[in-house]
Every structure is written in C-alpha cells, then in structure tokens.
Amino acid sequence: MNIDIKLHKDDLPDDIKLGNVIAVDGEFMGLDVRRDPLCLIQISTGNSDAHIIQLDRSKYNAPNLVKIFSDQSITKIFHFGRADMAHIKHYLKTDTNNILDTKIASKLARSYSDNHSLKTLIKELINIDISKQFQSSDFGGELTPAQLKYCANDVIYLHKIHDELIKILIREKREELYKDCLKFLKTRVKLDLALFKDDIWSH
C-alpha cells in the first residue's frame, strides 16, 4: 500500500479538510502523562493518508487540532484512546469529543481472544502485517522515515478495523454495551488525570 504521509510542524494547516470521521493516535515520551510529554499527533481520513503533527513542546499552541478534538460533529477513532485522550487533555487543554475505540470494541467483540493489540487486529481483520519495531522509540527529536511509517500505520487502518469489529458487535448483540463503555471513557480519563489509577468499581 502506498501511504501519503505529510509531516506538519506545531499544528495542522488552517485550510485542511479531513472529513467527519478521522483516525487519531498520539506518541509520547512514555506513559506517565505528567512526566512524559505529548510529542506527535497522527490523523488519517482512512484513505491511505497520514498527517503527522510534530508539536512545539515549549508552548503546545495548536488551535486547529484543538478545534478538531473538541468538535462534536467529527468522529475520532482511537486504539486505546484512554492514554491519547489523557495526554491531549493535559497538554492541549481540551476534551476529545465523539469517540470510538477499537481496543474497547475488540475486547467486547473478540471475547475468544486475550490479544487486542493493534498489530493483531490488523492481521486478523484485514490480513495485513505491520511492524511494531518502533513502538518504543524516541519521538521527541527528528523523525526518521521508518518512524514516520510506523506512526502512519497506527492510524491508516483504524477505519477498516472498526467497521469489522462493529459487524461482530451487531451480530453478537453487544453494540449497545460498546456504546455505553464509550460514554464512560472521558470519565476514565478524568480519573487517570486525578491519579485514580485503580479500577473504580473493584472491591
């Protein structure tokens, strides 16, 4: 597959049109939201394209991104959006509205498996192998072509994967349960940022 990768500095261009359903991912220096800064945002329209935004970590001034994330009319597809949304909330100071999540969908649809990684879903649902070699990588500096391709792979398949998972959820009568889980996702992010890491429902 030929992927159209565009690297943007600081923010998306003012005149860009991405449509009403986008796939989103973020790259951080680690998983501790207070310690490990948000470095990149990747966005795809689902048409073999990836817009990779290298954020200015000295000020995090990205009004075009903020507008997209907060826009209720634009659907955002994540894979484990919990981590991405926490970093977006902490560094870009905005909620992310109108969310879908392939990891949550997979856990409800693919109850026959304990593996819900993006690599596994891409292989099983659309029969494409991707490399996760750069999953643990320094995204804080200049990006190599291999890193850019890795970042693109994290978003370009999310539309198709989500479509396939929804088919299973509908067949197994679990779609409403999925929708209810999505409603709680923003609250789960708020709990994470307030340092309530444990399952709030556990004994």
Task: Please describe what each predicted stretch is.
Residues M1-H203:
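DEDD superfamily 3′-5′ metal-dependent exonuclease/proofreading module
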